Amino acid sequence: MVEAGQGADGKGSTIWKGSRYPVETSDSLHHYAGALCMGVDVSGECASVFYVVESLPGEQSVTQELVDQMNAAGYRAEVVSAYQTAGGAPYLDYTDTVFGQVYEGMDIVDTIAQTAVDENQKPTADITINSVSIETYQG
């Protein structure tokens, strides 16, 4: 995962009018590689932390064991197939809010994911997101 949005205090506090908001899940939205998701804090609600699910090129993030678990849990065949193709984190489905999908620029996400980190999994050098484009996918 590539996580961001720590807020001005560096503690993940909310920037949305001082309020947290509940987790929203959908059977139509899954944690495929590139999914843009809101992190859940200790209260079980979302604040300002978000993350992108990543699966590095050549990395098998969805093992046969995970496929078997998804099948046993009743995942639809097309969802299992999409995970096998794209990679991702099916264990996060139905636990937090998926609200977008990176469809251009995963190479940048992969580069960030390979950055050196400290013992707390924080990058040893700060990484700043300077801009983001949010648009409706036309493909």
Predicted region positions:
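Cyclophilin-like peptidyl-prolyl cis-trans isomerases
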Residues: 1-139
